[in-house]
Amino acid sequence: MSEHAAAASKRPDEYVPWREFLTSGYTASLALVSLGVWLHAADSLVVATMLPAMIADIGGAAFVSWTVSIYEIGSIVAGAASALITMRYGLRGPMSIAAFLFGAGCAASAISPNMGLLLIGRALQGFGGGGLVAMCFVALGVLFPRRYAARALAVVSAFWGMSAFLGPLIGGLFVEYANWRLGFWFFAMLSFMLSAWIALRQETATLEQGKIGTRFPLSRLALLCLAVVLISYGGVRVEALRTSALIGAGVLCLIWFFRRDGLAGPDRLLPHAPLDPRHATGATLLMLMMLPMATVAITAYGPLLMTVVHGTSALTAGYVVACSSIGWTLAAVSVSGSPERFDRIWIAIGMAVTTLSIAGFVYAVPAGPVWLIAVCALAEGGGFGLAYTFILRRITAVAPEEDMQRITGAIPTMQRIGYALGAAYIGIIANASGFLSIQTPDDAGTVARILFLACLPLAVVGLVAMLGLVRRHPYDASL
């Protein structure tokens, strides 16, 4: 047995030193997965930074919100289909195509003379990026021994966290010293290089033996697409009747999608009982949908509320919100070597800390001081980092073998569905609490208090769902 194989075959409940992990022979696979995730994470922030220059050049200000929404729609739909695609065709081909689609979308945006072609490019970026990230999570569960899964996910989390800083920096540099079109060409070049790298790597072919001969579920994907479009559009311009109707219709479509998918047998896109907390897989996905729903308020409304209530600059408010990414990265890197027998504890502590951070926002955002808001943001991200690092390893240990790729691919997809639902939900709450009629810091403080209080029930549902993942399982007796 080789040295690398011997290390990987050690008991997964032993501590994993960074030195062992980084010299284990999985470095190239780790770099590939990390780059795929970073491209997807950084792209949105780069585009947000370049957006004013893009609008000044090609116009289309009325469609600004759709540059984000259409990307998210593509990401969610492609992410949902990724598990089934990898089960049929393996990892190498689909991942390479997803990276190529992402690059093609960037190229289309780079040459766009108007907003129409740019939106087509954003749709391609969404389909490519969403599929790429979901397949990267499948790769984490398949290409790495479970002993190394937490370390691998910690590195991916670090790259995701770095995107919070490097994304706006890259976008700003292109706008300041070149032009926004070169920014898209930069990402296109990286994507095409990644596509070629994936296609030429033999190790990623290890999944190509699990093919299944099923029809591709276009009707279910169309239903999911419709659900996300309705929910996203409902949150773009918040009006009580219009928004409630659109989001209600979107949620009904989402429920219909889940029901139809559950009856599809081996053709399922998602694992069995995807939102049933009585099953470990359902508990995991429900938790990963509800907690992002509960935490999106600080990103969406935090900067504006801080500038009104506390008079902070936009830059300071942005750094406060970025503390969430810092907390996530630091926590993930710090604890990822923990033995597997502590996974349940870290998941429970992490999600509890995230929930407590929301309670902290209820006080800190309206009352201050600003450093306390930053501490709460650090705790929110840190809680996610503590838990998220071990969720993949935990669920791959207790989930049914036939659902392994479905659950790993569904993790980022359900997160994005949660963010979409959460953005629409807090949009309604903000509108109902007087956000549009804010005139004084006291008014803004009242809105902030209501917003974060309304997020607490969502977090509690996520905590209850978490119990289905961390409760004792027969597998735990082997640790």
PLM regions and their residue ranges:
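Alpha-helical transmembrane segments
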Residues: 31-34, 100, 220-228, 352
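Helix-loop-helix hairpins in multi-pass membrane proteins, especially solute transporters
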Residues: 82-215
